[in-house]
Every structure is written in C-alpha cells, then in structure tokens.
C-alpha cells in the first residue's frame, strides 16, 4: 500500500516525514538536510530553484527569489498586513483580478498556492527518492489560526503539486501528536507554544486514555497568523538600515540587492545571538555613492536584539491568556509546555514562556521537526497503520452569517470540536421578499463587516409572504480539515442551495486545473533537464578518461586506432555542446566502443607490470598497479553497461 506522507509546509523551512513501522522518520533532502528552506527562485534561463539552491542565489537575484510566501496565502491584497509586507520584501506583490495578493515574477503573475506548490513538489520528490516509489497522498499542516481561505489555498497548493491532500491538520496539534505518541499513558494537559517563521499559535491539548485509545483533544486554540521569525528579522533589518543611514545618509531600502544581503546577515546574527552574547554584522561593499564604496560594520549584543524584539515576544502572551480562558483552565493546570518552531530557540522567548506558565518548557521535542513528525503520525492513522490514536481538533474562529442590521449571528462558536454541524432557522427582512443572500463570515466581532468574509450565495424563488413568515434553514457543516460547507433551504418549498465555501477570492476550479497542468509540464522539463545533465556528465567523464588513457598508451596504439578514438572524442565534444539527446547518446556509444579495446590493453599492461615487480611483497604486488588498472577498466566497462 502506497505511503501517505506528512508535510510541514513552513513559512521559513519545510520538512517531510513518514511512518516506518511504528516509528516516524524525518526524511533528508537531496542536499542531506532534514529541513528545506521554503524559498523558490526563478532564474533567467527558465529554471525553477527550490530550497537551499534558491537561498544560495538570493543575494544576486532578489526580485525573482520568493520567500515567506505562506504569509500571503489566502490573503487579500488590501489586507493591512499584506500592505506592510510589500514595503519589506524585494519581490513584487500585486493585486490579482479577484482581489487576492499575488506575486509578479518575470512579467508573470503567480498565485501564492502556485509558489507553495513548488516547495511541496520538492518535499514529495524527497519522500519518493527515499521510499523508492511514487507518492500521491499527504497530510499537510497549517497554523491553527488559519482561516477557511488559507486552508483552502493550502489544499490547492497540494493539488497543484500533484498531491491528494488527505487531511489538513493544525501545527500545534501535530506537535502534540509527536510529543505524546511515545509518552507514558495517562491523562495530561499540555500547552503547545508554536512560534515559527511567519505565524504564532498556542493550543491547549488534553491527552487522555479513552477506551484503550490515546485521545488527543484540543480544548482551545488562539494565535496570530502574521507574527513569527520573519518579523524578528525585519525588526533587526530596520535597526541595521537606520544605523547605516545615520552613518552614511544612504537608505538601503531602495536597493533590493543590499536589502537581501541585510536580510541574510540579520537572520545569521539572530541565530548566533541565541548562543553568544554579541556578534558582528559585517557587510563590505554593501552599496556605493559618489564618494566610493560603503561598508556596514555594526556590533550587536544579545541585549540590543532583545530590546528590538521585546514587543513581538510580548504579543504572544495575550493569545496564551485567551486560549487558557477559552479552555476553562488556569496556568497551574497545565502539566507540560512544549515549544515548537525555530524562533523558540531564542532565550528571550524561552524565558517569557517560562515566566508565563510558571514551568520550564520541555527540551525533548525538536522544534523544527515535531510538526512534520505529527503529520506523519496522522497520515499513518488515516492509512490504518496506527490504530489506537484519536485526534479531536477544533475550529479556531467562530462561523456565522450576516443578519439584519449588519450583525454577525454565530452558528458555530470558536474552539468547537470538528467535524461538526449546526443548523439555524432564519426568515426574511422585508414583505414579499423572494430571495435571500446568505453572507458567510468567520471571526469574533459582532459587526459583520469587521469579520472575514468567506463567501455569499443566493437562495431564490421563495414564495412571496409577509416578513418573518418564510422559514429559511441554514446549515453549517465543517469537515475534519476545518473546511466549511454551507447550505440554505426554504422549508416551505424544499428548494435548497449549497456551496463548499470558496473564499470570495480564492482560486477557481479552472485556475487550479491550469496550475496543475503547468506544474506537470515543469516536472517533465525538470526530468529532461536532469537526464541531459547526467548524460553530459557521463560524456565528459568518458572523454577525460580516454584522453588520459591515450597518453599512457601513446606508443602502443596504431595510427588508425589513435585517429579513430580522436575522431570519436571530437564528435562527442561537439555533440555535448548541443541539445540533441539522441545524438549525444549515439556519439557516446561510438566512443565507448572505440575505447573498449584500449581499456583491455591498459588492463593487460598493468597486470604484467604487477607480476614483473619481483622485489615487493605479495600484497604490494597485487595492490597499487592492479588497483589503478581495475579502476580505469571498470570505469570504461560501466560506461559501456550504461549504454546497453
């Protein structure tokens, strides 16, 4: 049975894991790392780079290197949070036709799910390389405080990447699964404090034994979907830029290249200051003016960094208080505190959490990998590999509809366990009204316009009647992914209308299908690119080997043999410069055949040399000369085998 993988699609880094027997395994990517930067770059020669390779070239290609795209997913362009981000990133964020925030790269407009899909494709490929089989299904994690639009957009990203998303689960819940799966059985209440690259979540989770099952029940969740390590970096970037401006009068915000270098340096300094008390931010030739090049060199202490980000850390405490209140618990009733997300490595964050909860957070959970591990466990539950775990998650925000006077009437309160269903009967506001618009909202405000609009639809052909007489039954149904279906029915006629809530923006089915097709064509291009690269490498190796062998056997080859091999080398060199795969393969075979006799001769020569060396020990006789000969001969043979 094909594996379902678990993916932590992070703002800064992503991670993939799978269950092997009863143990989750975090899979290393092709570069040998257990996490992959969530960065996608578009190069001038139409190559798409993902992860470390994209990060490495970001300084020289800032406008076409996209990072922290998760902060834009499912968001409107006019959102104040997006407007703030526009000023901070070197790439271009623009308004799509549907009002969403998209990005513009190389004169093409791309939706955030399209960019996230590239990261997911890399995660999918990482898992496939490890498992040795195709992967089609995944569990993907999202911040607990993601709204419906953001969850839908994440599911779309999965589809574009060629994955069927079996379940969307909340990051803190996944971390709790990773923590609680192998812990001693028994009841406990844990707080998962998740401060990642772009989002913050706090979840209060009860782990209990119920009828032999290990039950994970989320009691309450809260958070901020625009607070994370990226904001800590930005605070430091602002400080460094303002210090530089004080010294030189030059504003680095106007220079994308300098801004990208500053971002890298800020991230590095922040990480260093988690273990050191001070560090130097040293960026030579960061910019230049009429008087010549300018260098940035600033000493930074841990205390200074903490003063810059103190307010950001404090912002995490209010959601913690709200989550505890919603769960009906006090701080003293929390048994364990778990830290998730790379930003929780900062000593100030750990100290603040310890002071609030009155206990030291656990250190036995890997903050970078716990979420992916939890996703893999949930994937194993869905595939039936793991039997005795039950996960009860909640909806993070209240859901309702707009009623008379612009008021939001809630049908499902926040922190309701999902899946869930709620029905309420409404009526018309005017006499002889024949249609009603159902405006679906998500949020906690009484005023409808202050909440997030998820979508609207009309129920028509209601028989004319005095206001208040028709009975319109509205049903909200949330699935296990936290995604909403809404239906409305006129009880008198039985006429009904229903929709799976697609945000008033969001991607249409046609757009997603087009993006899936586009991603598939890229995958085909990538495959061809890789095959050509491997073929060229094979050709270069054979050319080098043959040229070396010809020098060694210069006196033993006939003129015809030399000429034949030289011609074959020359033709292969010429073929490698082109893009005709069949021609390269053909010329590779010609040279392989031509050099086969030469390889036999080298082998025979080396063997006879080895036997002739009488003054050496037996081991010396058989080691060095023979070994060299074997390597060369084997190398040639392998090439021939490859051709066959």
From Swiss-Prot:
Induction of this protein: by what? By stress conditions e.g. heat shock.
> Which residue ranges are recorded for the region named Disordered?
603-644
Q: Name one GO molecular function term.
A: unfolded protein binding
The domain of life for this entry's organism is: Bacteria
- Name the UniProt key words of this record, in alphabetical order: ATP-binding, Chaperone, Nucleotide-binding, Phosphoprotein, Stress response
Ranges of Acidic residues compositional bias?
629-644
SUPFAM superfamilies, alphabetically? Actin-like ATPase domain, Heat shock protein 70kD (HSP70), C-terminal subdomain, Heat shock protein 70kD (HSP70), peptide-binding domain
Ranges of biased composition (kind: Polar residues):
609-623
Query: InterPro entries, per this entry?
Result: ATPase_NBD, Chaperone_DnaK, Heat_shock_70_CS, HSP70_C_sf, HSP70_peptide-bd_sf, Hsp_70_fam
Stored HAMAP family: DnaK
Instruction: Please describe what this protein does.
Output: Acts as a chaperone.
Family that this chain belongs to: Belongs to the heat shock protein 70 family.
State the name under which the record lists this protein: Chaperone protein DnaK
Q: Which species is this UniProt entry from?
A: Legionella pneumophila (strain Corby)
Q: Which gene encodes it?
A: dnaK
């Amino acid at each position: 049975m094909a594996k379902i993988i678990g993916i932590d699609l992070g703002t800064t880094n992503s991670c993939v894991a799978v269950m092997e027997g009863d143990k989750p395994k975090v899979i290393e990517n092709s570069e040998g790392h257990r996490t992959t930067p969530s960065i996608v770059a578009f190069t001038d020669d139409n190559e798409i780079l993902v992860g470390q390779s994209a990060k490495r070239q970001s300084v020289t290609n800032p406008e076409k290197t996209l990072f922290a795209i998760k902060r834009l997913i499912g968001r409107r362009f006019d959102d104040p949070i997006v407007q703030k981000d526009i000023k901070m990133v070197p790439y271009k964020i623009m308004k799509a036709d549907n009002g969403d925030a998209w990005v513009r790269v190389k004169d093409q407009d791309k939706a955030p799910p399209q960019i996230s899909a590239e990261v997911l494709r890399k995660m999918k490929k990482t898992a496939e390389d490890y498992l040795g089989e195709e992967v089609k299904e995944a569990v993907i994690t999202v911040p607990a405080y993601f709204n419906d639009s953001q969850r839908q957009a994440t599911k779309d990203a999965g589809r574009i990447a060629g994955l069927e998303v079996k379940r969307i689960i909340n990051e803190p819940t996944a971390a709790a699964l990773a923590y609680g799966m192998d812990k001693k059985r028994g009841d406990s209440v844990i707080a998962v404090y998740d401060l990642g690259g772009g989002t913050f979540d706090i979840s209060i989770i009860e782990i209990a034994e119920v009828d032999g099952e290990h039950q994970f029940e989320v009691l309450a969740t809260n958070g901020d979907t625009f607070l994370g390590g990226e904001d800590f970096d930005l605070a430091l970037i602002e400080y460094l830029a303002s210090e530089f401006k004080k010294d030189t009068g030059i504003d680095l915000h106007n220079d994308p290249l300098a801004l990208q270098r500053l971002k890298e340096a800020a991230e590095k300094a922040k990480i260093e200051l988690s273990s050191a008390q001070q560090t130097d931010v040293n960026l030579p030739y960061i910019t230049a003016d009429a008087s010549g090049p300018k260098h940035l060199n600033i000493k930074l202490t841990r205390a200074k960094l903490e003063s810059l980000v103190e307010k950001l850390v404090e912002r995490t405490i209010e959601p913690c208080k709200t989550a505890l209140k919603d769960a009906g618990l006090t701080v003293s009733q929390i048994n364990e505190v778990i830290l998730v997300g790379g930003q929780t490595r900062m000593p100030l964050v750990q100290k603040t959490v310890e002071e609030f909860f009155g206990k030291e957070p656990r250190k036995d959970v890997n903050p970078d990998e716990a979420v992916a591990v939890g996703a893999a466990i949930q994937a194993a539950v869905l595939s039936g590999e793991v039997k005795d775990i039950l996960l009860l998650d909640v909806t993070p925000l209240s859901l309702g509809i707009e009623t008379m006077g612009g008021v939001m009437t809630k049908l499902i309160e926040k922190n309701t366990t999902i899946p869930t269903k709620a029905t309420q009967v409404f009526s018309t506001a005017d006499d002889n009204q024949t249609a009603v618009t159902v405006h679906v909202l998500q949020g906690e405000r009484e005023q409808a316009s202050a909440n997030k609009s998820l979508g609207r639809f009309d129920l028509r052909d209601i028989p004319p009647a005095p206001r208040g007489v028709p009975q319109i039954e509205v049903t909200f149904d949330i699935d296990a992914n936290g995604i909403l279906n809404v239906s409305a029915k006129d009880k008198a006629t039985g006429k009904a209308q229903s929709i799976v809530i697609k945000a008033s923006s969001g991607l249409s089915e046609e757009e997603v299908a087009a993006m899936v097709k586009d991603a598939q064509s890229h995958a085909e291009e990538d495959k061809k690119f890789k095959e050509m690269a491997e073929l060229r490498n094979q050709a270069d190796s054979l050319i080098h080997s043959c040229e070396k062998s010809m020098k060694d056997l210069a006196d033993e080859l006939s003129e015809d043999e030399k000429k034949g091999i030289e011609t074959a080398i020359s033709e292969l060199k010429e073929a490698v410069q082109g893009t005709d795969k069949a021609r390269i393969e053909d010329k590779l075979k010609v040279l392989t055949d031509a050099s086969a006799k030469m390889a036999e001769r080298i082998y025979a020569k080396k063997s006879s040399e080895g036997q002739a060396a009488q003054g050496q020990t037996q081991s010396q006789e058989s080691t060095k000369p023979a070994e060299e000969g074997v390597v060369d001969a084997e190398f040639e043979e392998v090439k021939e085998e490859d051709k066959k």
